[in-house]
């Protein structure tokens, strides 16, 4: 059970201890079982922001097709996690859609790959694709990683209800991909936006608006 007072750590080789997270200002956090070495890596992100996100009926040319996962628990808190490469940046799970893959299949696959979670059901789907541009430095970095020069991402967002227990969450994922996250927490919609990297804030505001009736 996630605690919102002292910070509860979970580590496979040591007993639970109580502490506070430096990268998550004034917010308690629940750690996964990710080894300690993964929680110490640091990097910086540019403060430059992309243009504001926009909503479209279909993905535009030049944008990578992607699904976003807004995972909500029984207390209507939303799952967010800190990136290993940018520990100060917290985000909801997301990932690319494979060629010919249904977005509803992709969203469940990405959730399991990144968090180990399989106990979830789709409650709602955002009516439009939400697009955003990469800042120039991020675009260059991703061009090397992906081998394609995408302008940004076109995302289809889904609201999922978490039906399992917190112990199911494992940031090592299902073992099919390299871990992306270091810590995780259940947070309010406002905190989701507040703690996101700058160029994703407009996207997250639109996602919270799209699912507002379910999050109240």
UniProtKB/Swiss-Prot annotation:
GO BP, sorted A to Z: nucleoside phosphate metabolic process
Presequence range in chain numbering: 1-53
Gene3D superfamilies cross-referenced by the UniProt entry: Nucleoside Triphosphate Pyrophosphohydrolase
Keyword list, A-Z: Chloroplast, Hydrolase, Magnesium, Manganese, Metal-binding, Plastid, Transit peptide
Entry keyword Hydrolase: yes
Domain Nudix hydrolase stretches: 62-209
CDD domains in alphabetical order: NUDIX_Ap4A_hydrolase_plant_like (cd03671)
Membrane-spanning residues: none
Localisation: Plastid, Chloroplast
Effect of deleting the gene: No visible phenotype under normal growth conditions.
EC main group: hydrolase
This protein's GO CC annotations: chloroplast
Residues the entry annotates as binding Mn(2+): 110, 114
Cofactor(s) demanded: Mg(2+); Mn(2+)
Motif (Nudix box): 95-116
InterPro entries given in the database record: Nudix_hydrolase, NUDIX_hydrolase-like_dom_sf, NUDIX_hydrolase_CS, NUDIX_hydrolase_dom, RppH
Enzyme Commission code(s) on record: 3.6.1.-
GO molecular function list: bis(5'-adenosyl)-pentaphosphatase activity; guanosine-3',5'-bis(diphosphate) 3'-diphosphatase activity; metal ion binding
Tissue: Expressed in roots, leaves, stems and inflorescences.
Keyword Transit peptide recorded: yes
NCBIfam families documented for this protein: PRK00714.1-3, PRK00714.1-5
Protein family membership: Belongs to the Nudix hydrolase family.
Function: Mediates the hydrolysis of some nucleoside diphosphate derivatives. Can use diadenosine 5',5'''-P(1)P(5) pentaphosphate (Ap(5)A), diadenosine 5',5'''-P(1)P(4) tetraphosphate (Ap(4)A) and diadenosine 5',5'''-P(1)P(3) triphosphate (Ap(3)A) as substrates.
Protein name, as recorded: Nudix hydrolase 26, chloroplastic
Record gene name: NUDT26
């Amino acid at each position: 059970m996630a605690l919102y007072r002292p910070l509860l750590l979970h580590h496979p080789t040591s007993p639970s201890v109580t502490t506070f997270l430096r990268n998550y200002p004034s917010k308690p956090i629940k750690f996964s079982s990710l080894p300690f070495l993964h929680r110490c890596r640091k990097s910086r992100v540019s403060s430059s922001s992309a243009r504001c996100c926009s909503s479209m009926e279909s993905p535009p040319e030049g944008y990578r097709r992607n699904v976003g996962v807004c995972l909500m628990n029984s207390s209507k808190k939303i799952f967010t996690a800190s990136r290993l490469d940018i520990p100060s940046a917290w985000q909801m799970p997301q990932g690319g859609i494979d060629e010919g893959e249904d977005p509803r299949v992709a969203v469940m696959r990405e959730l399991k790959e990144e968090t180990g979670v399989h106990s979830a059901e789709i409650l709602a789907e955002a009516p439009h694709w939400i697009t955003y541009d990469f800042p120039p430095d991020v675009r260059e970095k991703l061009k090397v990683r992906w081998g394609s020069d995408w302008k940004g991402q076109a995302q289809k967002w889904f609201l999922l209800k978490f039906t399992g227990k917190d112990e199911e969450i494992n940031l090592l994922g299902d073992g099919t991909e390299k871990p992306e996250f270091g810590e995780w927490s259940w947070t309010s919609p406002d905190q989701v936006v507040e703690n996101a990297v700058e160029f994703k804030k407009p996207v997250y505001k639109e996602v919270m608006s799209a699912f507002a009736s379910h999050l109240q």
